[in-house]
Amino acid sequence: SYAASCGDIFIDIEKRDPVPENLLQQYASMGIRGVWMHAILYLLHPVKGSEEFSRGYETRLRNLSVLAERCKKYGIGIYLYLNEPRGMPYAFYEKNPDWAGVDVPRNHMRANCTSRQKPLEWLEEACAAVFEAAPALAGAFMITMSENPTHCNYAFNKTACPLCRDRDGADLIAEVVAAAERGIHASSPGAKLLVSDWAWREKGTDTDNAAFKRKVIDRLPKNVWFMSISEWGKETGAGGVKG
């Protein structure tokens, strides 16, 4: 089940509680054993020297732990939805030029260049810190392409980065997953990391992504769970519109 709150959901769980007790009771009665919640890692763990972008992270971590423990009482695990390492506003890169990836001017931000050392080191550190602070977490669910600016090839635009343009897109995905896996399992060896193949393609125009998916899978850590999208290659029809 997806707990539908999105954004900065852990800052005030009294005003906006994503999993109230009555909802958890209903979930448990229906046999639901897990919920996933949107999380933004820099709001839970700061980048050293740029703590101003993470104000309130201590409160968020405490609240996350409270929610995870509450869900656990009902036999339900919280899985954090991670789309990381999340791109940051331009001001962040003025202080951290060694993080800077491709420009995303429509969002007034950049992606993080994971061909550089620091973004992946921080991703591992942040995952370890979050799962240490909230030990009742069941795991995480990762989308590594599309969605939000993350690494330089998140939207198939690695050619705009001099460090990433000649690298295999499969390696860029696998390195992000590996960093998160190391961090999560350093603090919580029993946690599950589920990795979705959403938008996995060599190029954005590709219609057959099977070979590329195989390349990524072959590079993933052996102790993650792979999730495929059920509608790949399926004909669809909604409101008279076929797809």
Where would I find each of the regions flagged by the language model?
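Aromatic-lined carbohydrate-binding surfaces of glycoside hydrolases
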Residues: S1-G243
